[in-house]
Amino acid sequence: MEQDLARIEQFLDALWLERNLAENTLSAYRRDLSMVVAWLHHRGKTLATAQADDLQTLLAERVEGGYKATSSARLLSAMRRFFQHLYREKYREDDPSAQLASPKLPQRLPKDLSEAQVERLLQAPLIDEPLELRDKAMLEVLYATGLRVSELVGLTMSDISLRQGVVRVIGKGNKERLVPLGEEAVYWLETYLEHGRPWLLNGVSIDVLFPSQRAQQMTRQTFWHRIKHYAVLAGIDSEKLSPHVLRHAFATHLLNHGADLRVVQMLLGHSDLSTTQIYTHVATERLRQLHQQHHPRA
């Protein structure tokens, strides 16, 4: 089994070198593929002897076990890449994953907040407290830029230019983009940098823009808990929440106000336009609801 686990690490090293994938993606691949190896060894199989039927059985067992289709799709993607790698490296003479059927995924629309709900969320932090002033600045930046939460918590002081009103973001695949901040976000960043950040650092010298209460880099999970806290204060239904709720609102509201789809794609850092197009469905659905509510013949 150790040999098969070592093959996984070799594969991940190759992915990192060739594709420059994010650490979160590599960690997810490691978890999924380690589970595959353990499952195979429990049945007396190895990476060298596994057949398509084995892998299809594994996927079927996960469906029967209640795993979501998205989880199975992610696992299938990991297995396909891995076994393609083993085939290219001539560890195997075939690729058993090539015969696997893909699970059908429902097209899920991003969870959407109205502009009024976003405004309530942005007003929830108490700005006279340094910790909540930090959160206020983070929420404003998130809504102004549409950053991923991982991108937001990873920002450093050198990533922002208040004079130019832009933020430099290193996104997926280490792709760099510049995103405008807007007046509100710049104002709250300036206020936070003057009155909030020095208190949080308490003499500690780090380059992180939004440090935790312990003067360390904040985790995505911590910020997600903060968002949920403010959503409760703002009276927002928890079913409308996700860690990327303000990123989704940013995209949908831009499209509602007439922004070009390709501009939104660039701001979000999507490599594929089809990923951005799902927000047009959210915007269209919002228009349909408004039409039904307010048109006299709807």
Language model: regions and residue ranges:
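Conserved catalytic core of the tyrosine transesterase superfamily
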Residues: M1-A298
